[in-house]
């Protein structure tokens, strides 16, 4: 700080005389645009900017001394003839101008150090560079090159406008249209301290000009902050969609073969938000069990957003058991446009004497788990699902559609097990422990989705589980756990001696047929 203060004091003593001479001779001519043609092409705007900045600084009450000097390697004599002070005694400033690529950063670091000294000391040195240009053309004022007025405001307005354009969409900050000189003079006047500004106007390096002019606005190098905010805004832009999905939908365990489809943009909105026309798009899975006398257990648990996981434990002591639930949807169940669509699941049973168990558990968004303990020792029970939609069931565009589920029975006298458990959005289900030891026992499970369920906008996201393939020596138990007691689950097995015979039953809700 002390070398800077001594340097500024020495320059103040020298430059007061120069500013007085320039104020008497060149100030009045610089203010008039008609008379500004008497100056050379690169110097008239510089002296005018010096006069404007000096008057603005003196009106604020700060004892600032302005001096504008061009630095050109080819024309030092002409600058001295135009009564402008050539500060070649400042070694670092003039040497840094001859090497714009390497020394511009070091000079900006000087400016940052001097700007940091503003908050502690009283004296301020702000040096602004414009690099490039030749003496005969004198294209040192960028405002004149673009046809603007010859005032020094044009320089700073141009730079401030170029700073506004990239920063306005990213940062959203309001930047006033006051030029950089006026803002700098306002800052110097508010502190009421001697401010030395040596402006080195050599153009064609406007990105460096912007970097060196940014410390005029804020004391602690806002250019770094603004560029960090630019980068942070650019980084945050592609993450918005993923973060909004995680904020809206929570962290979801997706066990799927096609995670790109299940994590698509058509995510369902939770917590009672209405999401019409949103489809979860359960990826169409073609399922083929293992050949050659194996027990293929395929579990596709399409789970809702807040649904619990199903545990399917299948104990098959019989050779050919089939259990299938039917749905009874009752009393004004509004499932308008709920998106638990399972699109086109094609199911093919095993070909060579296998026991194929396929289970599709479509769960709703807030559905609890069902627990069906089925111990089947009968040999040939076969049931098929029946759906009863009752009493004002508004199933307009329900997305619990199992669209095009193609089911093909086995080819060689086998009987496959296909269980499609379509679970409602807020349905609770009881536990039924059914031990079937006779050979001719028929049970069929039906689910009752009760009245007043308003499932608009509640959507079901389905995740495909990987299929567990059990060997022919293993035994499986089919168990789906739930904790509710609203729905009555009735399981019904029907005996059929033909492998391809499936008898459809229209069941009442509370009937157990044997």
From Swiss-Prot:
Q: What is its main location?
A: secreted
Q: Give the UniProt record's GO annotations in the biological process aspect.
A: coagulation; negative regulation of flagellated sperm motility; sperm capacitation
InterPro entries on file: Semenogelin
**Extent of Basic and acidic residues compositional bias:** 50-59, 72-84, 243-255, 285-302, 404-422, 451-483
Cell compartment(s), UniProt: Secreted
Keyword Flavoprotein assigned to the entry: answer is no
Tell me the keywords, alphabetical order.
Repeat, Secreted, Signal
Enumerate composition-biased segments (Polar residues).
34-49, 138-160, 177-196, 206-226, 379-389, 440-450
- Per the record, which residues fall in region Disordered? 24-118, 133-491
Superkingdom of the organism of origin: Eukaryota
Q: What does this protein do?
A: Participates in the formation of a gel matrix (sperm coagulum) entrapping the accessory gland secretions and ejaculated spermatozoa.
What is its quaternary makeup?
A: Interacts with SERPINA5.
The Swiss-Prot or TrEMBL record describes its family as follows:
Belongs to the semenogelin family.
Q: Write down what this protein is called.
A: Semenogelin-2
Q: What organism does the UniProt record list as the source?
A: Ateles geoffroyi
What gene does the UniProt entry assign to this protein?
SEMG2
